[in-house]
Regions:
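Non-catalytic cap/lid and distal C-terminal segments of serine-dependent acyl enzymes
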Residues: 1-233
Length: 233
């Protein structure tokens, strides 16, 4: 079954897009759940429109929940909306009130592509008691601190702004403020160190296409995980 429409969020204080795909058959027990996060230019329908998700979900035991988070990088924005709070705190309650979804950590995953991959990691690591699995595909930015320092240094140069994307620079300033001061949860490697020390690491799946623009960043990131002794697939 596919459901696509909008839901009112108290945290966002507005209606926001929401798409849900469920298995075709009812089951006696609770369903597992995966929150699927879209990329920078996508929306809640992206996974429905550009993947075979309904076919995969039809015979399974998992409900797939796809929120709309704009260009927020799934953060609580300095100038904007608290999308991380919505996705990690309010949305699961909304979905459990509509469907027979398990609240157990081992039955809950979060996944995403590009901006959504970064968002999945960020959400899973800021709420490690909520997610037993995180999947990140062609994710960016995996090194947020370095990215913001580069924008601080070169962002006012016309050639850099044109190459990097003026719209994206504005996005990051909306998220972190004009000074681009990162919040504590923005740097994924730092969060991994913290969650590992708490012995709360979720299962981690990482992948990236060989010709993807994020491939170099992906290789640097997985290399860092190897050195840190953090397991992933």
């Amino acid at each position: 079954m596919r459901l696509s429409g909008s839901v009112y969020s108290k945290i966002l204080d507005m209606d926001t897009g929401l798409t849900i795909v469920t298995p075709n058959k009812l089951r006696e027990g609770k369903y597992k759940v995966v929150y699927l996060l879209h990329g920078l230019c996508g929306n809640d329908r992206s996974w429905l429109d550009y993947s075979m998700l309904p076919a995969y979900a039809a015979k399974g035991d998992t409900v797939y929940v796809m929120p709309d988070a704009g260009r927020s990088f799934y953060s609580n924005m300095k100038y904007g909306f608290d999308y991380q709070g919505y996705v990690t705190e309010e949305l699961p309650v909304i979905c459990r009130n509509m469907f027979n979804i398990s609240a157990a950590r081992e039955d809950t995953g979060i996944m995403g592509c590009s901006m959504g991959g970064y968002g999945a990691l960020r959400c899973a690591l800021t709420h490690p008691d909520s997610y037993g699995f995180v999947g990140a595909f062609s994710s960016g930015p995996l090194f947020a601190r370095a990215g913001m320092e580069e924008i601080k240094k070169y962002g006012d140069l016309p050639d850099y702004a044109e190459r990097f994307g003026l719209r994206l620079i504005k996005d990051f300033k909306a998220i972190y403020g004009d000074a681009l001061e990162l919040t504590d949860d923005a740097e994924i490697l730092d969060m991994l160190v913290k969650v590992k020390a708490e012995n709360k690491l979720p299962r981690i799946y990482l992948t990236c296409g060989r010709d993807d623009a994020f491939m170099k960043e992906h290789e640097l990131f997985t290399g860092a995980l190897d050195k840190m002794g953090i397991p992933y697939e």
